[in-house]
Amino acid sequence: MKWSYTPEIKGVSFKVDLQELVDLCLPSCSFLATRETFCVVNSILKERLLLLLAWTGKYVFWNVYGDCDNFGMLTGHTNAITDMHFSTDGTVLYTASADKTVMCWDTTSGTRVKKLKGHSSFVNCVHSARRGPSLVVSGGDDCTVLIWDVRKKRPATTLQNTFQVTAVTFNDTSEQVISGGIDNDMKVWDLRKNGLLYRMRGHNDTVTGLSLSPDGSYVLSNAMDNTVRIWDVRPFAPQERCVKIFQGHQHNFENILLRCSWSPDGRRVAAGSSDRHAYIWDTTTRHILYKLPGHNGSVNTVEFHPKEPIIMSVSNDKQIFIGEIE
């Protein structure tokens, strides 16, 4: 499939008719920022396509169904935003920042609900629990993994790592946390015992992104060794937990924390790349399905829409592309 372009669109002055996307070449539309480099993008919140852009200390919401409405801006962080994640129901947004804090935002009102302090250095990653209590995990340059009960301002649990933590996520039951860092290892922490349960070794460089599969059985990792891997995190899995390795994308001297993601049906995985392409692989064959060009800088994040066959990619070139993949 050819990846071609509509004319570049600045700001929010355009329309997207999802009924017509099947007849369009990709991407269907693009955003061009006028400020600092984008860090994060995500698409969630019920059945709408919600585009959320981040630059230094700020988030802007755009609804890109029909008339493109800029319907909110969140301000509060005093340094770069490094990561974000929505709650399962889409009502709360959790953000991590180089200002050493994690913030919780009400996505309906656009107000800050909580400011979580506990890290002593940059916070690199944040993730909320998929089910169970309202827990959030964050990791930072202070070599800690912090577990937060969002009803309180101080961390409920501190897990001490040896090196800086660059990626975190919960397992499906929210009884374990998976972390990755500059020591190349992925660690699974037992929250009932507040200790390390086991390690998963295989990457030869910093782990930059983690994503739990839709069924909760596997975790996807992206690393600076230029591999994306799938790991079996089910109880009583074989000792060799790395079950798939995907190659083709690249990391470079910029050492950006490139993230990764699953498609809603678990049949595809995606990752950003420093070679200016967005990569999508088939999880069964491990073949590259799409190598999508167009960006003029490292692609930091590639996200799947939760309902439609649509992806969004975000890059250091201050652009976000939205397009159909099938």
Regions found by a protein language model. Give the residues of each.
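Loop/turn-rich, solvent-exposed surfaces of beta-rich toroidal or solenoidal domains
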Residues: H251-I280
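Conserved strand-to-loop turn within each blade of WD40 beta-propeller repeats
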Residues: L53-T56, T95-D99, S138-D142, T173, ...
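Beta-strand-rich domains and repeat architectures in extracellular enzymes and scaffolds
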Residues: F31-T56
